Amino acid sequence: WGALFNTALKINNTQKIGLQATYSTNTDNIISDRSGYDFEQTRKISSTAIEYTENHLLTTRLYGEHQLTPKGIRLSWGGGVNQTSRNVPSLRRMFYFKNFDDTTDVTIPFQAYVPFGSADPYRSGRFYSNLEENIYNGNADLTIPFFLGTQKQSVKIGGLYQKRDRKFDARVM
């Protein structure tokens, strides 16, 4: 789901200020059950994965447009904050295998793959992660009109600032 907000105030014919905001969130809840044959390792495999992910996005922008002189010198400015987050509270995977020689005998169960020494998030294990990112930005532009002969021209001078903070935490078990 999401939300959108947009408003502007025209103070007079030469001054305008506005605010824009957008919010969006979505989630994924995925359960995968796979089975097949690994011919290289001569075994039958089966795996299960359960994953829940949530994503959030917020963008905001405050802006203004101002005509500073009767000759048309204009100032445009803007500033905003964007926030993004992604959370995987628990991704669980389990991997099972059975040798080709044992596939016809139903009394021989599949064996669970349990990593030795360090965690393996691709076969069996758990994965947790959290990503948060904030972006701060601002800009200003000055437009100066002039005539070159009889042709109306303009020159624009401006700048942009952007700062990004990102925090990512992950854990594999």
Region locations from a protein language model:
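Transmembrane beta-barrel wall of Gram-negative outer-membrane proteins
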Residues: W1-I30, L58-T60
